[in-house]
Amino acid sequence: LFTSAADTIARDGHIANKIGTFQIAILAKYFGIPYYVTGIPDQDKHSKDDIVIEMRDPQQVLSYRGIPNTVPEVKAIYPSFDVVPPHLISGVVTDKGVYVPYLLDHYFDSDVKKFY
């Protein structure tokens, strides 16, 4: 079993989490290991298109302590989060129960009271 929290959970089942989560989710799927995300779906995030990924300064990966670690021609991008598609997620564990990622809209229809 592989589990993680999520910084953002869109209603279409896409999640945003720290860099590396997408790669681990791919490996989990490949090796048949279930991946469960813990968190509360974001009501205003209907799809992956609503997830904004902050881009960090690429110089942070092109140098170490101000010393370049690559040739000047190399360019980089440095996103702060990965987006994981729902087909890699076995379920989303919420305060109202476990949901299939493709059915997260049902979370907002549920009459179960929140625990917080």
Predicted regions span which residues?
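Conserved phosphate- and dinucleotide-binding cores of soluble alpha/beta proteins
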Residues: 1-116
